[in-house]
Design a protein with these regions (language model features):
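Basic, short loop/linker segments at the boundary and entry of helix-turn-helix/winged-helix-like folds
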Residues: 24-67, 72-73, 384
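A short, ordered amphipathic alpha-helix with a cationic face
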Residues: 4-8, 54-56, 98
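Hydrophobic alpha-helical membrane-insertion signals
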Residues: 1-29
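Generic alpha-helical segment signature
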Residues: 11, 24, 37, 58, ...
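Short arginine-rich
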Residues: 91-95
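Anion-binding and metal-coordination hotspots
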Residues: 4, 66, 73-86, 96-487
Length: 487
């Protein structure tokens, strides 16, 4: 029999408690039980006046509003406020009554501009939630997985301009210069002189009065701090690169935000400085991080770098570099035709150049597989930190390392997939690197807290079941009491 009473209860007046309307297993209830949000007051106390001014909005509520947005992947702050107006669980989480007015969607933006801009508040919130995970001993920092993903910026790919940008200094530049000169002196060469461009040179010559290298980059007119990123063979977008580190259990340990046109190996140091003191034994990363500088940095700090095989970039039909054997004693290379490539110089990039004799190579039967140079001279380069790269190759072939590297898809890559699928991480509505860092910090904080809350609830449920089991056997089967108490 069909019942038709859908509209009869709309005008009812009832008395109820807000707490009764939120299910006991609701995610926001679990999160609220997992952490004491009062720590936010200590973080923002210096941002508010103590003895004058109008009463402000509760800072905890102010932080919880974007937290709801990133937790549920709501596309904008405006839509988040609309959802809060009609969602009882959201109101309960924020401490609002049914008839309380929800803050305007621009409230958080104004507070960010006036109070939180140019501060590390959101990174501190991420760190505080991470400390809770450490407190429950859920994190194992012995194996750390590092990777980067790109988040599409709020910028039209057709609105851009070209500008000349100075090449940013590498984090190992000073140390590399020092070791290059030491290597040259050990080989009887003079130290390299500092580059000095003639200030009279016109810009068309590529020179600059301060001696810095320059390059032409594409800059968005909407979000100049984003970077031009090649997304595929036929698609380029403005984006931000988010580097992330996590442990083998999927807990996010740190992050850094950079323009999308900067290579992961160049921006690795900013992330590494945040996590290097947490007790890392093995650091796992993809081939983008396999550089001599990163290998040396990790090995010098006593960390085992686990980096994959990197395919040689040799042209088809030519000998690969591995076919030229390095003789460490005589410091030379031996080609497939058993001819010597002797040391020639050490260049500014830190590579030793080994060259063959053009007269000898001219009549070599393997010449077409070796070089295309007009003078028939083959040049093979070797970085001064190449021994560290060779150590990485030895580590890669150790027993068990292949299985550890395979965990990347179950850890850091899974985190990126979850963030993009459930937490609105495919693109950002924020403009500027600072706001992007806020989004990343709160998104990763809510992912860690969501996981922590569920684990605490699951653990509490198991504990309650054990207590009931113990009471049952204590009352009805006294013989088993001693055995259960010992367990």
């Amino acid at each position: 029999m069909m019942t038709q009473n859908a509209d009869k209860k709309r005008e009812q007046i009832q008395m109820f408690c807000m707490d009764d309307l939120v299910p006991q297993d609701h995610l926001l209830r679990l999160i609220d039980q997992a952490i004491d949000w009062s720590f936010i007051y200590d973080l923002v106390i210096d941002k508010y006046s103590a003895d004058n001014g109008r009463p402000s909005m509760d800072p905890v509520m102010l932080i919880k509003i974007p937290f709801i947005q990133y937790l549920y992947g709501i596309r904008s702050m405006r839509q988040t406020v609309k959802e809060i107006e009609v969602n009882v669980a959201y109101r309960w989480f924020l401490g609002l009554e049914m008839m309380d007015k929800v803050p305007h969607f621009s409230t958080f933006g104004k507070n960010y501009t006036r109070r939180f801009k140019d501060t590390d508040l959101f990174e501190q919130i991420f760190s505080r939630i991470l400390q809770e995970c450490y407190k429950y001993r859920l994190i194992d920092p012995s194996e750390v997985f590092v990777d980067a993903t790109h988040v599409k910026a709020r910028a039209n790919s057709k609105k851009m301009r070209k500008r000349i940008a100075d090449e940013e200094a590498l984090f190992f530049e000073e140390q590399l210069k020092k070791e290059i000169n030491e290597d040259r002196e050990a080989h009887g060469k003079k130290p390299l002189k500092e580059k000095k461009e003639d200030p009279k040179d016109p810009p068309s010559c590529g020179g600059s009065s301060d001696g810095k290298e320059e390059k032409t980059v594409k800059e968005s007119t909407t979000d100049p701090e984003s970077g031009w990123f090649r997304k595929g063979e036929h698609k380029n977008v403005f984006a931000y690169s988010v580097q992330t580190a996590c442990d083998k259990n999927g807990w996010i340990l740190g992050y850094s935000v950079n323009p999308g046109n900067q290579h992961d190996s160049r921006t690795f140091k900013s992330l590494y400085d945040k996590i290097k003191d947490i007790g890392i034994q093995t650091l796992v990363a993809d081939a983008g991080y396999k550089t001599p500088a990163i290998a040396k940095l990790l090995l010098d700090d006593g960390i085992t770098p686990l980096l994959p095989y990197k395919r040689p970039m040799t042209k088809d039909g030519f000998f690969k570099k591995a076919e030229y054997v390095y003789d460490e004693y005589f410091d030379c290379y031996v080609c497939p035709n058993d001819q010597v490539l002797a040391y020639h110089t050490t260049n500014r990039s830190g590579y030793r150049e080994y060259k063959s004799c053009g007269i000898v190579c001219e009549g070599c039967p393997y010449l077409k597989q070796c070089t295309e140079s007009r003078d028939h001279v083959k040049v093979v380069t070797r970085h001064i930190w190449e021994p560290h790269m060779e150590k990485c190759e030895d580590i890669r072939h150790m027993i068990g390392m292949k299985e550890v590297y395979a965990q990347r898809k179950e850890t850091v890559e899974r985190l990126f997939g979850t963030a993009k699928e459930n937490h609105g991480f495919r693109y950002t509505q924020m403009i500027g690197k600072a706001r992007m860092e806020m989004k990343v910090g709160l998104t990763f904080a809510c992912m860690n807290l969501k996981k922590l809350a569920k684990m605490i609830a699951r653990k509490g449920k198991r504990g309650a079941q054990k207590c009931l089991l113990l009471i049952k056997y204590t009352l009805f089967e006294p013989k088993t009491r001693k055995t259960l108490l010992e367990c």
